[in-house]
UniProtKB/Swiss-Prot annotation:
Keywords: Activator, Nucleus, Repressor, Transcription, Transcription regulation. This is Mediator of RNA polymerase II transcription subunit 12. The keyword Repressor applies. Residues 151-162 have a biased composition (Pro residues). Residues 99-108, 1496-1512 have a biased composition (Low complexity). The lineage of its organism: Eukaryota, Fungi, Dikarya, Ascomycota, Pezizomycotina.
């Protein structure tokens, strides 16, 4: 029926919405803006032919005269059949039937309704369904345009029940009956009918339905209603307007007032409980299934796919055989609506589950069968979805994919799937999905996002999975085709990190993905930056170090040392100067560290001196008081530090030369100190002077003012040192040098005697004076009488011998700054040999000259000299080779090197392609090395510019080789000259020459006497015909071949020869070398620098031959110096690159023959400054090594301790060494040093393990809480500090913990954690019981005791958590699980949860600084009170890392234990973090069916029973077993997002709630039976005091 408009209510029909027009489009603007049409013409219009679909008839649209009446007259019910033509009685049809000739006046239409009337869109929208309403005539359109008024505001929201879905039956029936030509007319009188969709209240009453009858009080017209109108008057008493306090106060003052109030409240609670309890038994029965033919079954499925067919009719004939995968496929192929498909699945599932109960099975077995069926059904759903995804590319795949995803998601959220299995399968499928199908899975990921991240078990796996997929996408995305996919993955990872940060705590894979995860965040955003910092810290705290790691933040001293060492390779002094000043705030300590680095015996090379001098100059310019720092360094004294003080004095002399060091200030300090007042006979020689007084003797005086020089001489005289000896020494040296270089220096006085003086006796005052004198002599020798430089061919500035002598003197002094000036003068020479030698000198001291800043300038001067010689037609092959070798070290001179190589190539090509000279035709017959004109003929052949054939080359080569093999021929030609001729011979035919040379060398190796090889090989290497690397490779290839090795006499001697080939000349030996010999030593130095590992191998192979028994007499002479040579090479290699050299010695030499240990020990003893002797190592040696450990000697002390530990000694000695190391670790940790970590780092794993185990034993031996005594506070603080020391040692050596875990540590940690928990409970109880004593002195003692306890509790909890992280592998389940291991794991989790989530006084565990323990060092300037994460958060992260490796059963046991037996910590069950870590606990729908024994199980009965009140339960045990799902504290059984009262239902037993009411999702089924019962669902709607009645 359609109620009259004056009834005051909206009609009970479909909800008001925009109705689609015939064209399928919604004409909302037209419906809202179209005014009312013409009034009705007749109450009973004649039928007209049907021309369109049925429309809603607006019977409330009246004319103006009808609106003046108050109420319309009663009339019979207009029972217009839906099949009649609605247009007959509509104004629209009247307008169409009678065309008007005149436009309709706007005054004839009723005015638009105001907002107080019916909603504007109530019937206007429905009129859009009327044919022609969407196309109004011109007149009405024009009139509407002229009478446009503002639209009325929308009405209030309709009640919820008005949004019921449209009745498909009515619409379908209307469509079927629309073809009836005639209209059915019924004569029954009009009567009011209650709408079928109205809510029914108790007592057959209907809510919100009051039709107008004319008999209401407001319908009575009297004088009062005519004047004042009608309104409901609420009778309000006078008492209601006042406060209730007087009346209630009198009742409460009465003795029985509280009891009466309690009775009222109890009655109210009883009433509420009675109304809130469902007592009626469930009448639900699943709809039956019948056997149908295939045709009928197909017809039934088609009806199911038709939304107009009601489900209640289909529930009568559900066909058999539609189940599992077939059901889903049928729904997909028939396009069954998702809601109806879910209804079918529920019907089939309810019948399947009911079948288990019909067979007479027990309740437990029925539950198991039901769970198995749900798992199988979930598997079918998984296969169905997987099949649709794999069919990508077929027709309608997108629609099928959308349907399949919607259906499976609906089944998931309706709790019709096993959530744990389904989500696990989803993650596995997402992990295995290739990148081409990954977008589909990412779309589905948004559906299950919240469920996947609800628990730690799935959230961590999802985080790792997404990161791995993004990593693969980035690796394969070479052309940015996968950029959208990578962006989508990054978006998911960003959302997970920001919203579910705990799921990104990845103990095992954080190092792998941390950079990738950071790239997904916006590091410019402060929030993102804070999240990633917090996350990095949380992950770092739960990770166990896999390898040895020294302190996280490198000490500034070691950082500065690394900067100093880097200059050797970078040569960037300016950058190192700036970085060093910013690394250390104490500038005096910085200067001290630089001076130690320059003078330490554990670094190699004179380059350090010039590096230190340049840095000190730059620091003084930057404002550092360098003078005071140097004086303070010398005043400390370094007698026992084994420093090379000569390097210190060398630096100071360089500073004095550059006027950077203030000599006057030093002399003032020396006089103020009083050191110079010692007696004359107390110091007879300057070597006994102190360091600060020794500097007085070392100061250069050439550039000092006279008064300063006189003051110095005075102080020396007062110190007992004769200044005349220094002057005599200078004069003697000048006379000696002048005799060697008479063309440069004038003759000296006769009084000067020429003598040789040891270099160690020369002071830097003497060396500096001689160096400047030599430089001055070379410079003045270049000037003529006019004072200008003489540049003329044939008049060189220096001869070759003079240059070699000057270079020998200055290199012996170590005065490379003066040598650089001499080389600069040598560039003006026109002798290619001198220029080549000068370039080789720069190359030999390249690092020092680079630091001085002279290498690039000298190279360019040499290139200019070469260009000058080239213009003059002079070609020097030696100069070109030297310049190429030097230019390769200069990165900015590659273009010049390329030009030089072009010139070298032209020279070689010219020689090889030139036609043979006629002179060479008679060479083979007349050429002989015994000829007196042999050198002249060689010069004529080699430098004539003509060519040479191979036969001529063979003759010359054989003659030179024969001459090279004869020692007596050195009178004619030296070996160096012969090798130079060989180098000149090679360009004519390089390949042929190399073949002949290799054959000759192989012949020498196979000869019985190889003494000539050691004599001829260095010059061959010096001229470049042979390289050291090529010769070593040749020897190794020959020795590897057994056939060739058998032809070589004494093959082991070759290994010794290789060692001797690499040994440089002694430091004190004269370095007067010609160009060939100097180049050989240059090749030695480059080989040692570029091939240190190959050198170590040569040393190892040679040392192994010392004790071999098959040595013959030919190698006796080589074995005599073998140890010394090997030791010299080892010292050079160890000091050049300490870290890598020590690593190699540890891995290769120590494990070799005992002789290797002996030589290595001698080399180390020499460096460390002591000798252990032949006796076995003892503990005193280890203690001495530890005392010598500093920032420079650390690698060598490591190696020395390793040799001591691996020496052939008894186990007692090894244990004593471990004891010494353990004591050193404690001492260094107490003094906050980390040198002990470096000492232990290179020791074998057995020694490291012993040290760590001793620290663990000492740590566990410390009591957690000291007993109460007088010194308790002091003892407690001492015990905490001691435990902190041991914990630091354990943490530094954690890399020695095996992956399989350490036996016994897990049980000890469990006991310690249990003891900590028991102590917490007992102390908390005692504190709560002593509140009445807190006054006066007792109060202070209680507060102090409580503070100490809190501090100890926080420290020990954090310390034990760190130990658990380090020994996490000890808690893993063994291959054969034992009950004891499971119990320990459960106890550990329970203890961590109870302590973490306990509500302690002052929230002690929420403040991490209370622990006073920081596992990682704080940064300088970081004033935060804590590292950034709370101790409580860290504890939960540790628990999460344990849960990741524990089985699911342990999680369930832990949750049940906390619920049943840990009542003091019951609040933890409602903590979201607790649920996050221990879930999922009963995620599936079948896990909720476990009920108490006295309550009928839903699985055992025919249908789910409704819970009964406690009074109706049969007698049972006093403490019935609680359901598993209820004991976990996790809401289960209902869809987690279901917003209904059923989610709060619970079961009662004897008046006490015992668990959640298990609502069964398979029985939440609408239209399950043809006849609706009072309670046909699992939960009666009577719970809400209302139910929905359907026809």
């Amino acid at each position: 029926m359609i109620p009259h408009s004056s009834a005051g209510v909206q009609p009970w029909g479909h909800p008001l919405r925009a109705v689609h027009s015939a064209s399928g489009l919604t004409d909302i603007p037209h419906a809202l803006g179209q005014p009312d049409l013409h009034p009705e013409q007749s109450s009973m219009p004649a039928p007209q032919p049907q021309t369109g679909p049925s429309a809603v008839i607006d019977l409330t649209a009246n004319g103006g005269e009808a609106q003046e009446r108050e109420h319309p007259a009663k009339r019979l019910r207009l029972d217009i059949h839906s099949g009649s033509n609605a247009r007959d009685g509509s104004p629209a049809s009247a307008g169409l039937g009678e065309p008007k000739s005149t436009p309709v006046s706007t005054s004839s239409k009723p005015p638009p309704l105001s907002w107080r009337g019916r909603p504007v869109w109530s019937f206007q929208a429905l009129l859009s369904e009327v044919p022609g309403a969407g196309e109004p005539n011109v007149e009405s359109t024009t009139a509407a345009a002229q009478d446009v008024k503002p639209l009325s505001p929308p009405s209030f929201p309709a009640p919820p029940w008005k949004h019921s879905p449209a009745d498909p039956t009515a619409s379908s029936a209307a469509g079927l009956r629309g073809v009836t030509p005639a209209k059915e007319v019924r004569t029954t009188p009009y009567h009011i009918e209650v709408p079928s969709v109205a809510p029914v209240l108790r007592g057959d009453k209907v809510a919100d339905f009051l039709p107008w009858t004319g008999n209401h009080p407001e319908d009575v017209l009297n004088e009062q209603t005519a004047k004042q109108g009608y309104y409901d008057r609420t009778q309000v008493s006078q008492n209601e307007s006042n406060t209730a306090r007087p009346s209630l106060y009198a009742q409460l003052k009465h003795r029985s007032g509280l009891q009466m109030l309690s009775s009222v409240f109890a009655a109210a609670l009883e009433k509420r409980q009675g109304h809130s309890m469902v007592t009626a038994p469930s009448t639900f029965k699943p709809p039956p299934r019948v056997t149908l033919t295939d045709n009928k079954r197909e017809a039934w499925l088609r009806d199911l796919a038709n939304p107009t067919v009601p489900l209640r009719r289909l529930s009568r004939t559900i066909p058999h055989g539609i189940r599992g995968r077939v059901l889903l496929d049928q729904c997909l192929t028939k396009w069954v609506p998702v809601g109806r498909a879910v209804w079918l699945a529920k019907c089939v599932g309810a019948n399947e589950i009911r079948a288990f109960k019909r067979k007479g099975t027990s309740g437990a077995l029925a539950i198991g069968l039901e769970a198995k069926w749900v798992r199988d059904w979930t598997t079918n759903v998984q296969q169905f979805l997987d099949g649709v995804i794999t069919s990508c590319g077929v027709a309608d795949w997108k629609l099928k994919m959308t349907y399949a995803v919607s259906l499976t998601a609906r089944l998931f959220f309706e709790q019709l799937l096993d959530h744990d299995q389904y989500l696990g399968w989803f993650l596995s499928s997402l992990e295995a999905a290739p990148l081409n199908t990954l977008p589909v899975w990412l779309l589905m990921l948004g559906i299950y996002w919240n469920h996947l991240l609800r628990y730690r078990k799935r959230g961590r796996r999802l985080a790792e999975l997404l990161l791995e997929k993004l990593s693969k996408a980035n690796k394969l995305d070479s052309s940015n085709t996968l950029r959208p996919l990578a962006d989508r993955l990054s978006l998911h990872i960003r959302k997970l990190t920001l919203e579910h940060t705990s799921s990104a705590v990845l103990p095992h894979s954080w190092d792998k993905y941390k950079d990738l995860l950071s790239s997904c965040l916006n590091m410019k955003d402060s929030v993102h930056r804070a999240v990633i910092q917090n996350l990095s810290e949380r992950n770092a705290r739960v990770q166990r170090p896999r390898k040895c790691q020294e302190t996280a933040n490198q000490p500034p001293q070691q950082r500065v040392i690394q900067l100093f060492d880097s200059i050797r390779s970078t040569h960037d002094v300016t950058a190192v100067s700036i970085a060093s000043l910013s690394a250390i705030d104490d500038k005096a300590a910085l200067v001290f560290k630089l001076l130690e680095w320059v003078s330490t015996p554990f670094r190699h090379g004179i380059c350090r001196v010039y590096t230190g001098a340049r840095l000190l100059r730059k620091w003084k310019v930057a404002g550092v008081d360098v003078d005071s720092c140097i004086i303070s360094f010398l005043a400390e004294g370094h007698d026992g530090s084994h420093l090379n003080m000569d390097n210190i004095y060398h630096i100071i002399s360089e500073l004095v030369r550059s006027q950077t060091f203030s000599v006057g200030r030093y002399l003032q300090w020396l006089m103020a100190k009083g050191v110079a007042d010692c007696s004359k006979d107390s110091h007879q020689h300057h070597k006994h002077l102190s360091d600060d007084l020794e500097l007085l003797l070392q100061l250069p005086v050439s550039r000092l003012p006279d008064h300063v020089r006189n003051l110095r001489n005075t102080l020396l005289h007062r110190a007992g040192i004769e200044v005349s000896k220094e002057e005599a020494m200078i004069a003697t040296l000048k006379a000696s040098i002048a005799q060697r270089l008479p063309n440069i220096f004038s003759s000296v006085t006769d009084s000067a005697m020429s003598c040789d003086v040891a270099q160690s006796e020369l002071t830097w005052a003497v060396k500096s004076e001689i160096g400047q004198w030599i430089r001055r002599g070379v410079t003045e020798g270049r000037r003529g009488s006019t004072g200008k430089f003489q540049i003329a061919i044939g008049q060189p500035v220096l001869s070759a011998d003079e240059f070699y002598s000057i270079r020998d003197i200055l290199e012996g002094f170590g005065d490379l700054s003066m040598l650089a000036d001499v080389l600069n003068q040598a560039t003006n020479c026109d002798d290619g040999l001198i220029l080549a030698s000068a370039a080789d000198t720069v190359n030999y001291h390249f690092q020092s000259f680079s630091v001085i800043g002279a290498s690039t300038g000298l190279f360019r001067r040499f290139v200019e000299s070469y260009a000058r010689l080239k213009r003059l037609g002079v070609t020097s092959l030696d100069l070109i080779l030297s310049l190429i070798d030097l230019g390769l070290h200069l990165p900015g001179e590659f273009n010049t090197v390329a030009l030089l190589r072009q010139d070298l190539g032209r020279i070689e090509n010219k020689s090889s392609m030139a036609a043979p000279s006629p002179l060479s035709d008679h060479i083979p017959a007349t050429f002989n090395e015994t000829d007196s004109l042999f050198p002249e003929k060689l010069d004529q052949l080699l430098f004539s510019g003509g060519g040479m054939d191979e036969s001529t080359m063979d003759a010359i080569f054989n003659a030179l080789i024969t001459s090279l093999g004869r020692a007596e021929d050195r009178v004619k030609l030296s070996a160096n000259d012969i090798c130079r001729y060989l180098a000149y011979l090679r360009p004519f035919h390089p390949k042929h020459f190399d073949i002949m040379l290799i054959r000759w060398i192989c012949g020498l190796l196979k000869s019985s006497t190889r003494t000539m090889l050691s004599r001829v090989l260095p010059p061959l290497i010096g001229v470049g015909c042979v390289t050291i690397q090529a010769f070593i490779f040749l020897v190794r290839r020959l020795l590897q071949s057994e056939k060739v090795a058998s032809m070589i006499p004494h093959p082991n001697d070759l290994k010794i020869d290789l060692l001797q080939l690499l040994v440089p000349p002694p430091a004190g030996q004269s370095r007067y070398f010609d160009m060939v010999t100097y180049r050989f030593h240059l090749s030695q130095k480059e080989f040692l620098s570029k091939h240190p590992e190959e050198t170590f191998n040569i040393i190892r192979d040679a040392i192994a031959l010392i004790d071999s028994q098959d040595q013959d007499n030919h190698s006796d002479q080589g074995q005599m110096n073998l140890n010394q040579n090997a030791m010299v090479l080892l010292q050079i290699l160890l000091t050049k690159n300490p870290e890598s050299a020590v690593q190699y010695c540890t891995e290769k030499l120590i494990t070799q023959h005992s002789t290797s240990m002996m030589v290595l020990t001698k080399a180390l003893d020499t460096l460390l400054g002591f000798d252990t002797g032949p006796d076995p190592p003892n503990v005193s040696v280890a203690e001495k090594v530890i005392e010598l450990t500093n920032d420079f000697s650390l690698p060598f002390c490591q190696l020395k301790l390793q040799t001591l530990f691996n020496a052939e000694a008894g186990s007692n000695v090894k244990n004593e060494i471990v004891d010494v190391m353990f004591k050193a670790a404690i001492a260094d940790s107490r003094s906050r040093r980390s040198n002990w970590v470096g000492l232990v780092r290179l020791m074998n794993q057995d020694a490291v393990r012993q040290i760590r185990e001793r620290a663990e034993k000492s740590f566990f031996a410390i009591p957690l809480f000291e007993e109460a005594n007088e010194g308790r506070s002091m003892n407690n603080g001492t015990s905490l500090e001691t435990a902190k020391l041991y914990l630091t040692i354990i943490e530094k050596l954690a890399y020695s913990i095996p992956d399989s875990g350490v036996q016994g540590v897990g049980s000890v940690l469990v006991e310690k954690m249990d003891l900590l928990l028991h102590k917490l409970v007992s102390m908390q109880t005692s504190y709560n019981g002593s509140t009445e004593m807190r006054h006066g002195i007792d109060a202070e003692q209680v507060i102090q005791s409580r503070t100490e306890f809190e501090r100890s509790l926080a420290f020990w909890f954090s310390a034990l958590l760190r130990m658990i992280v380090l020994h996490r592998s000890a808690f893993s389940i063994p291959p054969a699980p034992k009950s004891s291991a499971s119990q320990e794991q459960t106890r550990l989790l329970i203890s961590i949860f109870c302590i973490t989530l306990a509500r302690l006084p002052d929230s002690v565990l929420r403040l991490f600084p209370t622990a006073d323990y920081f596992p990682h060092s704080m940064r300088q300037g970081d004033h935060r009170p804590c590292p950034g994460i709370l101790l409580q958060t860290h504890a939960l992260d540790v628990a999460a890392s344990l849960i990741d490796m524990f089985p699911d059963e342990l999680r369930h046991q832990c949750a049940r234990f906390l619920k049943d037996k840990c009542s003091p910590f019951a609040q933890s069950q409602n903590d979201s973090r607790f649920l996050y870590l221990l879930g999922p606990l009963g995620d599936g729908p079948t896990s909720n069916a476990t009920l108490p024994v006295s309550i009928p199980s839903p699985a055992a009965s025919g249908s789910t029973p409704a819970p009964t009140p406690s009074g109706s339960l049969t007698a049972g045990p006093s403490n019935p077993p609680q359901p598993a799902s209820a004991s976990l504290g996790v809401p289960t059984g209902l869809p987690e997002g279901l917003n209904c009262g059923a989610s709060h239902l619970c079961l009662q037993y004897r008046g006490r709630a015992i668990g959640a009411y298990p609502v069964r999702p398979w029985e939440l089924l609408e239209d399950a039976a043809p006849i609706a019962g009072t309670n046909d669902t699992a939960v009666s709607l009577g719970y809400f005091d209302a139910r929905r009645v359907r026809a």
